[in-house]
Amino acid sequence: MTAILERRESESLWGRFCNWITSTENRLYIGWFGVLMIPTLLTATSVFIIAFIAAPPVDIDGIREPVSGSLLYGNNIISGAIIPTSAAIGLHFYPIWEAASVDEWLYNGGPYELIVLHFLLGVACYMGREWELSFRLGMRPWIAVAYSAPVAAAAAVFLIYPIGQGSFSDGMPLGISGTFNFMIVFQAEHNILMHPFHMLGVAGVFGGSLFSAMHGSLVTSSLIRETTENESANAGYRFGQEEETYNIVAAHGYFGRLIFQYASFNNSRSLHFFLAAWPVVGIWFTALGISTMAFNLNGFNFNQSVVDSQGRVINTWADIINRANLGMEVMHERNAHNFPLDLAAVEAPSTNG
Protein backbone atom coordinates (compact mmCIF):
# COMPACT_ATOMS: atom_id res chain seq x y z
CA MET A 1 0.00 0.00 0.00
CA THR A 2 1.34 3.36 -1.00
CA ALA A 3 0.41 6.58 0.84
CA ILE A 4 0.70 9.84 -1.05
CA LEU A 5 1.34 12.87 1.15
CA GLU A 6 0.67 16.29 -0.33
CA ARG A 7 2.20 19.38 1.16
CA ARG A 8 -0.56 21.70 2.33
CA GLU A 9 -0.33 25.19 0.93
CA SER A 10 0.30 27.70 3.68
CA GLU A 11 -2.53 30.17 4.14
CA SER A 12 -1.83 33.70 2.98
CA LEU A 13 -1.23 36.50 5.46
CA TRP A 14 -4.48 38.15 4.37
CA GLY A 15 -6.39 34.91 4.90
CA ARG A 16 -5.00 34.53 8.41
CA PHE A 17 -5.88 38.16 9.14
CA CYS A 18 -9.47 37.62 7.94
CA ASN A 19 -9.83 34.50 10.08
CA TRP A 20 -8.50 36.36 13.13
CA ILE A 21 -10.83 39.34 12.59
CA THR A 22 -13.92 37.12 12.26
CA SER A 23 -12.97 34.50 14.87
CA THR A 24 -15.46 34.00 17.69
CA GLU A 25 -12.68 32.41 19.77
CA ASN A 26 -11.03 35.78 20.52
CA ARG A 27 -11.47 37.08 24.06
CA LEU A 28 -13.10 40.18 22.54
CA TYR A 29 -14.77 39.77 19.15
CA ILE A 30 -13.42 42.25 16.59
CA GLY A 31 -15.33 41.69 13.36
CA TRP A 32 -15.29 43.83 10.25
CA PHE A 33 -17.39 46.50 11.92
CA GLY A 34 -14.85 46.48 14.75
CA VAL A 35 -12.08 47.38 12.30
CA LEU A 36 -13.80 50.76 11.89
CA MET A 37 -15.28 50.96 15.39
CA ILE A 38 -12.01 50.67 17.32
CA PRO A 39 -10.12 53.60 15.72
CA THR A 40 -13.17 55.90 15.60
CA LEU A 41 -14.13 55.36 19.25
CA LEU A 42 -10.49 55.61 20.39
CA THR A 43 -10.17 58.90 18.51
CA ALA A 44 -13.41 60.30 19.94
CA THR A 45 -12.50 59.23 23.49
CA SER A 46 -8.93 60.55 23.32
CA VAL A 47 -9.92 63.95 21.92
CA PHE A 48 -12.79 64.21 24.43
CA ILE A 49 -10.48 63.63 27.40
CA ILE A 50 -7.83 66.07 26.15
CA ALA A 51 -10.37 68.76 25.24
CA PHE A 52 -12.33 68.35 28.48
CA ILE A 53 -9.13 68.96 30.41
CA ALA A 54 -7.35 71.61 28.34
CA ALA A 55 -9.37 73.07 25.41
CA PRO A 56 -9.41 76.90 25.31
CA PRO A 57 -12.73 78.83 25.26
CA VAL A 58 -14.91 78.51 22.14
CA ASP A 59 -16.82 81.27 20.32
CA ILE A 60 -20.01 79.18 20.22
CA ASP A 61 -22.39 81.96 19.09
CA GLY A 62 -19.98 83.42 16.53
CA ILE A 63 -20.10 86.87 18.17
CA ARG A 64 -16.55 86.97 19.59
CA GLU A 65 -17.68 86.00 23.08
CA PRO A 66 -15.87 82.72 23.85
CA VAL A 67 -17.36 80.28 26.36
CA SER A 68 -15.02 78.26 28.59
CA GLY A 69 -15.64 74.53 28.89
CA SER A 70 -12.45 72.80 30.07
CA LEU A 71 -11.09 72.05 33.53
CA LEU A 72 -7.93 74.13 33.07
CA TYR A 73 -10.05 77.16 32.20
CA GLY A 74 -11.97 77.27 35.47
CA ASN A 75 -14.59 74.53 35.20
CA ASN A 76 -15.28 71.49 37.35
CA ILE A 77 -16.71 68.07 36.44
CA ILE A 78 -20.29 69.38 36.64
CA SER A 79 -19.87 72.65 34.71
CA GLY A 80 -17.25 71.39 32.23
CA ALA A 81 -18.13 70.41 28.66
CA ILE A 82 -16.87 70.20 25.11
CA ILE A 83 -18.34 73.40 23.67
CA PRO A 84 -20.11 72.92 20.30
CA THR A 85 -18.55 74.21 17.09
CA SER A 86 -19.06 77.94 16.46
CA ALA A 87 -22.13 79.30 14.69
CA ALA A 88 -19.63 81.01 12.38
CA ILE A 89 -18.76 77.55 11.01
CA GLY A 90 -22.40 76.47 10.70
CA LEU A 91 -22.68 73.03 9.12
CA HIS A 92 -19.37 73.18 7.29
CA PHE A 93 -17.07 70.19 7.62
CA TYR A 94 -14.29 71.63 9.77
CA PRO A 95 -11.25 69.35 10.12
CA ILE A 96 -7.96 70.74 11.43
CA TRP A 97 -6.56 71.31 7.94
CA GLU A 98 -9.47 73.63 7.06
CA ALA A 99 -8.36 76.14 9.70
CA ALA A 100 -5.51 78.62 9.27
CA SER A 101 -3.98 77.41 12.53
CA VAL A 102 -4.65 75.03 15.41
CA ASP A 103 -5.47 78.05 17.59
CA GLU A 104 -8.19 79.11 15.14
CA TRP A 105 -9.52 75.53 15.00
CA LEU A 106 -9.75 75.40 18.79
CA TYR A 107 -11.32 78.88 19.02
CA ASN A 108 -14.05 77.82 16.58
CA GLY A 109 -14.78 74.59 18.44
CA GLY A 110 -13.26 72.13 15.98
CA PRO A 111 -12.88 69.36 18.61
CA TYR A 112 -16.68 69.11 19.00
CA GLU A 113 -17.20 68.17 15.35
CA LEU A 114 -14.27 65.77 15.45
CA ILE A 115 -15.57 64.01 18.57
CA VAL A 116 -19.23 63.86 17.50
CA LEU A 117 -18.63 62.57 13.97
CA HIS A 118 -16.15 59.90 15.12
CA PHE A 119 -18.45 58.95 18.01
CA LEU A 120 -21.52 58.53 15.79
CA LEU A 121 -19.56 56.43 13.32
CA GLY A 122 -18.17 54.37 16.21
CA VAL A 123 -21.51 53.60 17.89
CA ALA A 124 -23.08 52.76 14.52
CA CYS A 125 -20.24 50.28 13.96
CA TYR A 126 -20.74 48.92 17.49
CA MET A 127 -24.35 48.19 16.52
CA GLY A 128 -23.16 46.50 13.33
CA ARG A 129 -20.63 44.50 15.35
CA GLU A 130 -23.42 43.25 17.62
CA TRP A 131 -25.30 42.00 14.56
CA GLU A 132 -22.11 40.48 13.11
CA LEU A 133 -21.28 38.52 16.28
CA SER A 134 -24.90 37.35 16.56
CA PHE A 135 -24.71 36.13 12.95
CA ARG A 136 -21.43 34.25 13.52
CA LEU A 137 -22.89 32.51 16.60
CA GLY A 138 -26.17 31.63 14.88
CA MET A 139 -28.18 33.95 17.11
CA ARG A 140 -31.12 36.14 16.16
CA PRO A 141 -30.40 39.83 15.41
CA TRP A 142 -32.51 41.55 18.09
CA ILE A 143 -29.61 42.72 20.29
CA ALA A 144 -28.49 45.10 17.54
CA VAL A 145 -32.09 46.17 16.94
CA ALA A 146 -32.46 47.09 20.62
CA TYR A 147 -29.19 49.04 20.55
CA SER A 148 -30.50 51.03 17.59
CA ALA A 149 -32.63 53.05 20.03
CA PRO A 150 -29.74 54.83 21.82
CA VAL A 151 -27.89 55.12 18.49
CA ALA A 152 -30.93 56.88 17.01
CA ALA A 153 -31.18 59.15 20.06
CA ALA A 154 -27.49 60.11 19.81
CA ALA A 155 -27.78 60.76 16.08
CA ALA A 156 -30.84 62.94 16.70
CA VAL A 157 -29.19 65.33 19.20
CA PHE A 158 -25.69 65.37 17.69
CA LEU A 159 -26.43 65.32 13.95
CA ILE A 160 -30.08 65.61 12.86
CA TYR A 161 -30.90 68.54 15.16
CA PRO A 162 -27.86 70.62 14.10
CA ILE A 163 -28.70 69.91 10.44
CA GLY A 164 -32.29 71.08 10.95
CA GLN A 165 -31.21 74.20 12.83
CA GLY A 166 -28.43 75.02 10.39
CA SER A 167 -25.40 74.86 12.68
CA PHE A 168 -23.41 72.47 14.85
CA SER A 169 -23.51 75.20 17.51
CA ASP A 170 -27.08 74.03 18.21
CA GLY A 171 -25.91 70.47 18.98
CA MET A 172 -25.86 69.14 22.53
CA PRO A 173 -22.72 70.13 24.48
CA LEU A 174 -20.66 67.19 25.74
CA GLY A 175 -20.98 67.73 29.47
CA ILE A 176 -23.39 67.52 32.41
CA SER A 177 -24.57 71.13 32.77
CA GLY A 178 -24.28 71.55 28.98
CA THR A 179 -26.79 68.72 28.55
CA PHE A 180 -29.18 70.44 30.96
CA ASN A 181 -28.75 73.73 29.11
CA PHE A 182 -29.56 71.94 25.83
CA MET A 183 -32.72 70.49 27.38
CA ILE A 184 -33.90 73.84 28.73
CA VAL A 185 -33.27 75.69 25.46
CA PHE A 186 -34.93 72.85 23.51
CA GLN A 187 -38.04 73.21 25.67
CA ALA A 188 -38.03 76.99 25.22
CA GLU A 189 -37.75 76.82 21.44
CA HIS A 190 -39.72 73.66 20.61
CA ASN A 191 -42.06 72.97 23.58
CA ILE A 192 -40.86 69.36 23.66
CA LEU A 193 -42.81 68.52 26.82
CA MET A 194 -46.02 68.98 24.83
CA HIS A 195 -44.87 66.72 21.97
CA PRO A 196 -46.58 63.30 21.93
CA PHE A 197 -43.42 61.51 20.77
CA HIS A 198 -41.54 62.80 23.83
CA MET A 199 -44.43 61.59 26.01
CA LEU A 200 -44.05 58.13 24.47
CA GLY A 201 -40.33 58.24 25.25
CA VAL A 202 -41.01 59.11 28.89
CA ALA A 203 -43.47 56.21 29.08
CA GLY A 204 -40.82 53.97 27.50
CA VAL A 205 -38.03 54.89 29.92
CA PHE A 206 -40.08 54.99 33.13
CA GLY A 207 -42.21 52.03 32.10
CA GLY A 208 -39.12 50.05 31.12
CA SER A 209 -37.50 50.64 34.50
CA LEU A 210 -40.74 49.67 36.27
CA PHE A 211 -41.12 46.46 34.25
CA SER A 212 -37.45 45.61 34.74
CA ALA A 213 -37.77 46.01 38.51
CA MET A 214 -41.00 43.99 38.57
CA HIS A 215 -39.49 41.17 36.50
CA GLY A 216 -36.25 41.02 38.47
CA SER A 217 -38.00 41.01 41.83
CA LEU A 218 -40.52 38.36 40.71
CA VAL A 219 -37.79 36.05 39.41
CA THR A 220 -35.63 36.56 42.51
CA SER A 221 -38.64 35.83 44.72
CA SER A 222 -39.54 32.59 42.92
CA LEU A 223 -36.14 30.89 42.65
CA ILE A 224 -36.15 27.11 42.86
CA ARG A 225 -34.07 26.43 45.97
CA GLU A 226 -31.22 23.99 45.39
CA THR A 227 -29.41 24.77 48.65
CA THR A 228 -30.01 24.35 52.36
CA GLU A 229 -31.48 27.08 54.55
CA ASN A 230 -27.96 27.92 55.72
CA GLU A 231 -26.74 28.80 52.20
CA SER A 232 -27.73 31.54 49.80
CA ALA A 233 -30.34 30.53 47.24
CA ASN A 234 -28.08 32.13 44.64
CA ALA A 235 -25.44 29.46 45.28
CA GLY A 236 -27.71 26.78 43.81
CA TYR A 237 -27.25 27.96 40.24
CA ARG A 238 -24.69 26.43 37.88
CA PHE A 239 -23.76 28.32 34.72
CA GLY A 240 -25.26 26.57 31.71
CA GLN A 241 -27.57 24.32 33.70
CA GLU A 242 -30.48 22.81 31.77
CA GLU A 243 -33.00 23.05 34.60
CA GLU A 244 -35.07 26.20 35.06
CA THR A 245 -33.73 28.43 37.78
CA TYR A 246 -37.07 29.95 38.80
CA ASN A 247 -40.69 28.85 38.87
CA ILE A 248 -42.54 30.88 36.24
CA VAL A 249 -45.83 29.24 37.26
CA ALA A 250 -45.43 30.55 40.81
CA ALA A 251 -44.48 34.01 39.55
CA HIS A 252 -47.46 34.01 37.15
CA GLY A 253 -49.81 32.94 39.93
CA TYR A 254 -48.52 35.60 42.31
CA PHE A 255 -48.76 38.46 39.84
CA GLY A 256 -52.10 37.29 38.45
CA ARG A 257 -53.58 37.43 41.95
CA LEU A 258 -51.86 40.72 42.78
CA ILE A 259 -53.32 42.55 39.76
CA PHE A 260 -55.57 40.31 37.64
CA GLN A 261 -54.99 37.11 35.70
CA TYR A 262 -54.35 38.54 32.25
CA ALA A 263 -51.92 41.20 33.49
CA SER A 264 -49.36 38.42 33.95
CA PHE A 265 -47.38 36.67 31.21
CA ASN A 266 -47.45 32.88 31.13
CA ASN A 267 -45.02 32.72 28.20
CA SER A 268 -41.41 33.53 29.02
CA ARG A 269 -40.57 34.43 25.41
CA SER A 270 -43.45 36.89 25.11
CA LEU A 271 -42.48 38.40 28.45
CA HIS A 272 -38.88 39.04 27.49
CA PHE A 273 -39.85 40.40 24.08
CA PHE A 274 -42.14 42.87 25.85
CA LEU A 275 -39.38 43.88 28.29
CA ALA A 276 -37.09 44.65 25.34
CA ALA A 277 -39.63 46.24 23.00
CA TRP A 278 -41.28 48.68 25.42
CA PRO A 279 -38.28 50.97 26.14
CA VAL A 280 -36.81 50.54 22.66
CA VAL A 281 -39.97 51.68 20.88
CA GLY A 282 -40.33 54.57 23.35
CA ILE A 283 -36.79 55.81 22.68
CA TRP A 284 -37.29 55.37 18.93
CA PHE A 285 -40.25 57.73 19.16
CA THR A 286 -38.28 60.27 21.18
CA ALA A 287 -35.47 60.25 18.61
CA LEU A 288 -38.09 60.70 15.89
CA GLY A 289 -39.59 63.59 17.86
CA ILE A 290 -36.21 65.33 18.17
CA SER A 291 -35.68 64.82 14.45
CA THR A 292 -39.03 66.43 13.57
CA MET A 293 -38.52 69.32 16.01
CA ALA A 294 -35.12 69.85 14.40
CA PHE A 295 -37.08 71.23 11.44
CA ASN A 296 -39.39 73.22 13.77
CA LEU A 297 -42.37 70.88 13.74
CA ASN A 298 -42.84 71.57 17.43
CA GLY A 299 -44.95 70.35 20.35
CA PHE A 300 -48.63 71.22 20.77
CA ASN A 301 -49.49 74.86 21.41
CA PHE A 302 -52.55 75.30 23.63
CA ASN A 303 -51.68 78.86 24.67
CA GLN A 304 -54.73 80.96 25.60
CA SER A 305 -57.03 78.28 24.21
CA VAL A 306 -59.62 78.52 27.02
CA VAL A 307 -61.71 81.71 27.19
CA ASP A 308 -64.89 82.71 29.00
CA SER A 309 -68.07 84.05 27.41
CA GLN A 310 -66.58 87.54 27.33
CA GLY A 311 -63.50 86.38 25.47
CA ARG A 312 -61.22 86.73 28.50
CA VAL A 313 -58.44 84.16 28.74
CA ILE A 314 -58.69 81.55 31.48
CA ASN A 315 -55.13 80.38 32.03
CA THR A 316 -54.37 76.66 31.91
CA TRP A 317 -51.16 74.78 32.62
CA ALA A 318 -50.33 75.23 28.93
CA ASP A 319 -50.17 78.98 29.52
CA ILE A 320 -47.91 78.49 32.54
CA ILE A 321 -45.55 76.39 30.41
CA ASN A 322 -45.63 79.04 27.67
CA ARG A 323 -44.65 81.73 30.18
CA ALA A 324 -41.75 79.56 31.38
CA ASN A 325 -40.70 78.97 27.76
CA LEU A 326 -40.55 82.72 27.10
CA GLY A 327 -38.50 83.24 30.24
CA MET A 328 -36.01 80.55 29.27
CA GLU A 329 -35.77 81.85 25.71
CA VAL A 330 -34.93 85.43 26.68
CA MET A 331 -32.20 84.18 29.03
CA HIS A 332 -30.23 82.02 26.61
CA GLU A 333 -27.79 83.50 24.10
CA ARG A 334 -28.64 86.84 25.69
CA ASN A 335 -25.99 88.74 23.73
CA ALA A 336 -26.68 87.07 20.38
CA HIS A 337 -30.12 88.65 19.94
CA ASN A 338 -32.17 91.26 21.76
CA PHE A 339 -35.53 89.49 21.72
CA PRO A 340 -36.70 85.89 21.56
CA LEU A 341 -37.71 84.80 18.08
CA ASP A 342 -41.40 84.76 19.06
CA LEU A 343 -41.33 88.47 19.83
CA ALA A 344 -38.90 89.47 17.09
CA ALA A 345 -41.07 87.83 14.44
CA VAL A 346 -43.92 90.31 15.01
CA GLU A 347 -44.04 92.87 12.22
CA ALA A 348 -42.98 96.32 13.37
CA PRO A 349 -45.67 99.03 13.14
CA SER A 350 -45.26 101.41 10.24
CA THR A 351 -44.56 105.06 11.01
CA ASN A 352 -45.37 108.09 8.91
CA GLY A 353 -42.44 110.42 9.00
UniProtKB/Swiss-Prot annotation:
GO CC annotation terms, alphabetical: chloroplast thylakoid membrane; photosystem II
| Main location as per UniProt | plastid
What catalytic activity is recorded? 2 a plastoquinone + 4 hnu + 2 H2O = 2 a plastoquinol + O2
- Gene3D superfamilies recorded: Photosystem II protein D1-like
User: What GO terms are given for molecular function?
Assistant: chlorophyll binding; electron transporter, transferring electrons within the cyclic electron transport pathway of photosynthesis activity; iron ion binding; oxidoreductase activity, acting on diphenols and related substances as donors, oxygen as acceptor; oxygen evolving activity
**How does this protein assemble?**
PSII is composed of 1 copy each of membrane proteins PsbA, PsbB, PsbC, PsbD, PsbE, PsbF, PsbH, PsbI, PsbJ, PsbK, PsbL, PsbM, PsbT, PsbX, PsbY, PsbZ, Psb30/Ycf12, at least 3 peripheral proteins of the oxygen-evolving complex and a large number of cofactors. It forms dimeric complexes.
Q: What does this protein do?
A: Photosystem II (PSII) is a light-driven water:plastoquinone oxidoreductase that uses light energy to abstract electrons from H(2)O, generating O(2) and a proton gradient subsequently used for ATP formation. It consists of a core antenna complex that captures photons, and an electron transfer chain that converts photonic excitation into a charge separation. The D1/D2 (PsbA/PsbD) reaction center heterodimer binds P680, the primary electron donor of PSII as well as several subsequent electron acceptors.
Q: What is this protein called?
A: Photosystem II protein D1
Gene name per UniProt: psbA
